[in-house]
Amino acid sequence: RLMDCTLRDGANVVGKGFDAEITKIVLDILTESNVPIIEFGNAGGIGAYEVAGFTNALTDMEYLDLVQPYLGKSEIGMFLNAKRFREPNVELAASKGMKFLRCGADAGDARKISEVPVKTIKKCGMKAYYSAMKAYLLTPEELAEEAKFLESIGLDEFTIMDSAGTMMPDDVKRATECCKNAVKIPVAFHCHNNLGLSAANAIAAYESGADILDCGLMGMARSAGNLPTEAAVAFMQKYGEFKDIDLYAMLNGIDQRLLPAMEKHSYHDAIPPYDLILGVSGAHSSFGKTFNAVAKDTG
């Protein structure tokens, strides 16, 4: 499965959160193209606006009100940094229809700070997902033990997060295999592109049994960015996966709505929709003039 993090991790591109216009555009694109899981809100997670002063964003209540028309179209939830846990924020998310909160803490800190947040999320009737941030701080075996502990207290999903984009495909393979062998809950992988390996690492995770891949439209995320959602859909469909996701609806939405909206933020899309289609189809870019002429002739 695929979890799109554009509206959470991608919000780092513009500050700590997208404005209402772009938030709605992204929600439209993701739900209309059948993306199954969406993480949204303040880049620092629910509560970060007040607790951490991440005010370059809408408030949590504004995001939660804005998302109401989209509930039921995808599984929608928010991030929760374990260090910023406040029970009323978890209760608020549940009351506003969130399907999950993804608790996050640095790898190795789960026993110290994550037990109460995870149990509170479950108590409030939501799924408890987890991000082991900076997963490379632990050996694969240590990471697997942390996943086992979290599973034992009710966790529903465990994410291996390559926060600095430093992991190599072999690192991803070992970490994913260890975690998959240790737990029965789904294991996800969240890559960053600092070494240009986001796609290679996502494929390594998939081939090693990962159940969920994190990504963001146009690669939007902190630092060097994430795995582009549209690229993930394109290459995973070559593996016979993500068949229910409408790649062309997604690309049209990016081309016609999201790219123009992001011009005010001077965001550069490294793999524009046209170039992605060339990769999907195996057509060399030198055929561009012919494609355009045929398109013009056929309307």
Model-flagged regions — what are they?
Residues 1-299:
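Catalytic cores and adjacent flexible loops of soluble metabolic enzymes
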